[in-house]
Amino acid sequence: MAQFGGEKYGGRHTDEYGNPIQQGAGAHRGGGIMGGGQQAGQHGTTGVLGHGTAGQHGTTGGGLGHGTAGTGGALGGQHRRSGSSSSSSSSESDGEGGRRKKGMKDKMKEKLPGGHGTTTDQQQYGTAATHGQAQQHEKKGIMDKIKEKLPGGQH
């Protein structure tokens, strides 16, 4: 929503979305989902999960966004947030009574279906009476397991 008078009398006071714009040499805007808002100063802003825009001294864009540096270069360290929305624990046992932080690879493995990668081979000992086919000690494929369960004879 533009104000009356337009750019002719003092410039535009809102952006294209109707948000107020600070006027002056040190006006900066920090965007993002979790805030930022309008700030004025010479040191720029930090946008959380969005992007920050810089003035004289630059900014640090944190999280998933990006920052743009001004004439003075970026100040401060970046705030890092993970993009994971997993409900699983972020640490696991290291086998010696302590705990260690899971890496990205471990978290991704946890989300994939089909087990956790630890398989053990099972063997049968002794003798057993068989009807029809002999027992095999090989792993069966998915199709073999399905065919076994279908009525109407063995395929």
Curated annotation (Swiss-Prot):
<dbReference type="GO" id="GO:1902075">
    <property type="term" value="P:cellular response to salt"/>
</dbReference>
<dbReference type="GO" id="GO:0071465">
    <property type="term" value="P:cellular response to desiccation"/>
</dbReference>
<dbReference type="Pfam" id="PF00257">
    <property type="entry name" value="Dehydrin"/>
</dbReference>
<comment type="similarity">
    <text>Belongs to the plant dehydrin family.</text>
</comment>
<dbReference type="GO" id="GO:0009611">
    <property type="term" value="P:response to wounding"/>
</dbReference>
<dbReference type="InterPro" id="IPR000167">
    <property type="entry name" value="Dehydrin"/>
</dbReference>
<feature type="compositionally biased region" description="Gly residues">
    <location>
        <begin position="27"/>
        <end position="39"/>
    </location>
</feature>
<dbReference type="GO" id="GO:0009737">
    <property type="term" value="P:response to abscisic acid"/>
</dbReference>
<feature type="compositionally biased region" description="Basic and acidic residues">
    <location>
        <begin position="136"/>
        <end position="155"/>
    </location>
</feature>
<feature type="compositionally biased region" description="Gly residues">
    <location>
        <begin position="47"/>
        <end position="76"/>
    </location>
</feature>
<feature type="compositionally biased region" description="Polar residues">
    <location>
        <begin position="118"/>
        <end position="135"/>
    </location>
</feature>
<feature type="region of interest" description="Disordered">
    <location>
        <begin position="1"/>
        <end position="155"/>
    </location>
</feature>
<protein>
    <recommendedName>
        <fullName>Desiccation-related protein clone PCC6-19</fullName>
    </recommendedName>
</protein>
<feature type="compositionally biased region" description="Low complexity">
    <location>
        <begin position="83"/>
        <end position="92"/>
    </location>
</feature>
<dbReference type="GO" id="GO:0005829">
    <property type="term" value="C:cytosol"/>
</dbReference>
<dbReference type="GO" id="GO:0009631">
    <property type="term" value="P:cold acclimation"/>
</dbReference>
<keyword id="KW-0346">Stress response</keyword>
<dbReference type="InterPro" id="IPR030513">
    <property type="entry name" value="Dehydrin_CS"/>
</dbReference>
